Amino acid sequence: MKNISEFSAQLNQTFDQGEAVSMEWLFRPLLKMLAEGDPVPVEDIAAETGKPVEEVKQVLQTLPSVELDEQGRVVGYGLTLVPTPHRFEVDGKQLYAWCALDTLMFPALIGRTVHIASPCHGTGKSVRLTVEPDRVVSVEPSTAVVSIVTPDEMASVRSAFCNNVHFFSSPSAAQDWLNQHPESSVLPVEDAFELGRHLGARYEESGPTNGSCCNI
């Protein structure tokens, strides 16, 4: 099985071919705003990132996975206000994530402690975690694992990647799913957390940049 660095390198290479490229200056600020628990207006994103409103609108229109409400406000991109199986509680606010790896990756990007609850994809048994920005505090059950896929293309990050990245209560609980997805793997939660840190590193230095440019 691949090690963490190999998974990270392969996934980053695939992300570079898809919608994730457009998010390097946008993703972390957007996550922090979504973590407040309210829809995020385009104008707020522009103010936070230093980009023109029209440019932010154009980028959002190119992202097939972004979730917008009727007013055109962002309600989800990785972290979402729309219910999913992956419950993500931060500062008492009930949010959700698109996949199991998101729940482990996002605490570092938003700088907050998160309480996570998600059903085992094989048995339905609840998997519960507390994750701080720099460590996994607790996992119940301790045998929990996360499925990882490495798709060849990532035109839509949610359909190509997120929809196949689940919690399982144990490796044995994941076996039937792995038999059906032979190109996939499972990682212990601690290893999946480290993978999330590797993948999140590309966004950690992002900040306001004025004008159009290069990361889009």
Curated annotation (Swiss-Prot):
A GO MF term: alkylmercury lyase activity
| Pfam families from the UniProt entry | HTH_15, MerB
Q: Which InterPro entries match?
A: MerB, MerB_HTH_dom, MerB_lyase_sf, WH_DNA-bd_sf
Q: Where is the signal peptide?
A: none
Keyword Lyase listed: yes
Which BP terms from GO are recorded? response to mercury ion
Listed under catalytic activity are: an alkylmercury + H(+) = an alkane + Hg(2+)
Asked if the record carries the keyword Lyase, the reply is yes
- For this protein, what is the EC number? 4.99.1.2
The record's listing under Gene3D superfamilies reads:
3.30.450.410
Alphabetical UniProt keywords: Lyase, Mercuric resistance, Mercury
| Family the entry assigns | Belongs to the MerB family.
Stated role: Cleaves the carbon-mercury bond of organomercurials such as phenylmercuric acetate. One product is Hg(2+), which is subsequently detoxified by the mercuric reductase.
- Protein name (Swiss-Prot/TrEMBL): Alkylmercury lyase
Q: Which lineage ranks, top first, belong to the organism behind this chain? A: Bacteria, Bacillati, Bacillota, Bacilli, Bacillales
Task: Quote the gene name from the UniProt entry.
Answer: merB
